[in-house]
């Protein structure tokens, strides 16, 4: 949970202090992934970077075997959206919430992917960062007041 809080706090600093929307967006996406990874490992002992297909819900096993095999190290690796699909398939509330909210989130993830720090050349708008931040905070159950803050030094 500490990593998720740190990533969310980092995203908020990038957005509100530095006005660096690209880095804020990257940190928000990573916070979501870290949250899914934590839940998968803590609750189900699933490592997203070394998945055993037998650990997954039946409906996802064939997809894992055909789509997620790393040809270099021979390990199955789940991408972000699939991590939440697995959680949902296992009956996890966070995974189910992700799937329910996916239609609202997809344009935000697309914006992150089309940004320079993603895979494209488009600028990130501040409102997109705020929208994704709102979604991530809701999905993770984190309140802004629980985010770590740096102390103010009066020098």
Segment roles from a protein language model:
Residues 1-2, 100:
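TPR-adjacent "capping" and linker segments in tetratricopeptide-repeat scaffold/adaptor proteins
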Residues 2-86, 151-152:
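Amphipathic alpha-helical interface elements
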Residues 91-155:
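Charge-enriched, short contiguous segments at helix-coil
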